[in-house]
């Protein structure tokens, strides 16, 4: 018994705990150490045990003086003085094992001993402390469960309200459905028309650009050819410049010189003719003079041909330059037209982008609101999950407490059955005792009758 799971209190501590936890009022004030030690008073212990049973089981005082309903006694009036003791023993026999006291006996109430009584009271006080702590914990869990249930109801209501708001946001009102449909149809038609117009203009611009690019490529090719021809002509011109004069003055001077030369040649020719006429007979000199004249004539003819060729080349180069300038102006016009088309296309794209941006912004606002509502719902769901986990833990603890209560009830039922068995044994013993008393009374009555009859006979004999 020394290794039990409750502390052993001394008499002073037991008196203090009994005054604070078990006995109240005048009974607690009148309790002293002499009532418990060294010779415990049975009536004080009966009062303490009854009060402890009232605290733990809720048994009222009058129940100790009542016959149990589930028992049948032939002479209940004979047990009126014995009922409080019997009920107290029965309840203590089931209550003290819960307090880790397993050696309780009936003699501990009839003839209590100080050490055993202090141990029994220590176990009862420890159990009452444990019961109060468990009750506080249970009440705290119960309060948390109620508050969690209220919060869960509030969160469910908020969740339902958020779902209703989300449905209202997702659904278009009846009075705005027609307008919303018209707006959506108008936006779709506008987008389709813009897409078609943009596609057509893009195709036209692409065709015009491709055609103009082909023309530009042809003209560029022609221009490159002309540039090559100009370069070749310039090379020819450079080569001819060595042969001809560069400036008009020089050309004039050269022409004058040539004229002078021609005149000189004419004069020389005249002289030659004169000489020919003079020297007609000079046959040997005539061929050489003719060859020289032919050479000079050939040179003059080459010079005139080169001059005409140079003039034609210059004219052709001027024509090519004019054509290049006209092609460049046409190319500039095409570029300006292309830029205007690009600007128009950019304006159309900007209008389409603004319309699309407004639509996307509206959709984004709706999506953002949906996301906020969904985040709120997720937060509510997370809180609900946390509350649900707390409720499940509380329910598990409640189940554990209920299991402990059920175990206590089972133990109480077993003790009840045990006490009923004891009561039946006492009942049978009492009935046997009553039968013996009746038989003894009958025997004594018979003996008394015999003795009275014998005395009467003796008195009759003495009188006669």
UniProtKB/Swiss-Prot annotation:
Quaternary structure note: Component of the NDC80 complex, which consists of NDC80/HEC1, CDCA1, SPBC24 and SPBC25. The NDC80 complex is formed by two subcomplexes composed of NDC80/HEC1-CDCA1 and SPBC24-SPBC25. Each subcomplex is formed by parallel interactions through the coiled-coil domains of individual subunits. Formation of a tetrameric complex is mediated by interactions between the C-terminal regions of both subunits of the NDC80/HEC1-CDCA1 subcomplex and the N-terminal regions of both subunits of the SPBC24-SPBC25 complex.
Modified residues (N-acetylmethionine): 1
Keyword annotations from UniProtKB, A to Z: Acetylation, Cell cycle, Cell division, Centromere, Chromosome, Coiled coil, Kinetochore, Mitosis, Nucleus, Phosphoprotein
A single cellular component GO annotation: cytosol
Region (Interaction with the N-terminus of NDC80), start-end ranges: 1-385
Organism this protein belongs to: Homo sapiens
Family membership noted in the UniProt record: Belongs to the NUF2 family.
Localization annotation: Nucleus; Chromosome, Centromere, Kinetochore
Gene Ontology MF annotations: microtubule binding; protein-containing complex binding
Protein name: Kinetochore protein Nuf2
Taxonomic path: Eukaryota, Metazoa, Chordata, Craniata, Vertebrata
PTM summary: Can be phosphorylated by AURKA and AURKB.
Record PTM Phosphoserine, positions in chain: 171, 247
InterPro entries linked: Kinetochore_Nuf2_N (IPR005549), Nuf2_N_sf (IPR038275)
Gene behind the chain: NUF2
One Gene Ontology term from the biological process aspect of the record: attachment of mitotic spindle microtubules to kinetochore
Region annotation Interaction with the C-terminus of NDC80 and the SPBC24-SPBC25 subcomplex: where it falls in the sequence: 386-464
Principal location listed in the UniProt entry: nucleus
